[in-house]
Amino acid sequence: MPTLLRLKKRRFQCKNCRRITVAKTSIVEKNCQISNLVRQKVSQLLTEKMSLTDIARRLRVSTSTVYRKLDQFSFKEHFDKLPRVMSWDEFGFKKGELAFVETKLITILDNHRQTTIRNYFLKYPLKIRQKIRFITMDMSGSYMLLVRRFFLNVQIIIDCFHIIQHLGRAFLKTRIAIMNQFDKKSLPYRALKNHWRLFQKDRCKLSLNSFYSKTFRQTLAPHEVIAKTLVFSKELTDYYTLYQLLLFHFQEKRVGEFFDLIEENRSKVNHYFQTVFRIFLRHKQYIQNALETDYSNAKLEATNKLNKDIKRLDFGFRNFINFKKRVFITLNMHKKRTYPVLYRC
């Protein structure tokens, strides 16, 4: 419930100069009607996934008050140090942004043009940039050119998620192409369409629990569904075997076997897999770094999810600076648990 305090301030008059002073209080600032505790609560709620309008409605203050509190925050950028490991990724905000993160978010640039990225990192001395050892990113070729130019001692690491994603998409398109060869009312078509998720999964991670399949009208385990479906197409069986072998070698970090299998089947597969294999061979050294190290873009992907949540909750910030402040407040401020204290005046 909102509480209204009627505060009467005592006045003191100097007997010598006759000047009058008013007693000060820690409850509110001078010439303000909103208490300091409410302002502190605004700062606390800015770290949560709440829109600025919801914060204002919850604390019974205006939205402008919340915006003014947000404007009071400032984050000074230090160009005298960089982490040993960095992650690069982009997310959508109007024209697109690029984020850099280690254990804490370093910065968010207002676009992902090479000029913007170059001008930002040129603010760091060469000696500082040479201390970076690893940078994880997706397969965007434009970033790799910048990394090799401005970070001389860096090893580029392709995020493992994007490697698996490329393989999964190639097999998904292959399965759809084979599925469309059958009549839409036939059993092979319905089996490939209804149980597509089982084919995308790693075979080693399939559940052992049985379920009732409406397609086959019987209770089957996931691996039994796959076995019954693969009987309909020799081509699909070959591609599924290749897909699962690539996943196995990648999960077991077998670099040699992974690329040997790609080289062996490069000219035998369809254009979906040929495109993926061509990309993998072009970035062979970076994928090898991913298999030989434990670094990934997991933290940054989680950060991007938070950025999108903030953007959605606030119906999109028109001001990029305010959006950047909100992200930094949410990520970099330490949240301490507070307890209500009851006292008598």
Q: What would you call each of these model-derived segments?
A:
Residues M1-E97, Q130-I132, S142, R149, ...:
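Short, positively charged, Gly/Tyr-enriched micro-motifs
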Residues I20, F73-K76, F150, A170, ...:
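Conserved, well-folded catalytic cores of nucleic-acid-processing
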Residues N31, K104-I128, F134:
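Active-site beta-loop-alpha junctions of metal-dependent nucleic acid enzymes
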Residues L46, N111, D138:
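Conserved residues at beta->alpha junctions
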Residues M50, Y143, V154, F171-T174, ...:
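A generic secondary-structure signal for well-formed alpha-helical elements
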Residues L70, K95-F100, K127-Q155, F161-Q165, ...:
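Acidic/histidine-rich catalytic cores and adjacent linkers
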Residues V85, I156-I157:
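Conserved beta-strand scaffold positions in the cores of enzyme catalytic domains, especially
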Residues I163-K184:
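Short alpha-helix plus adjacent loop in nuclease-associated cores
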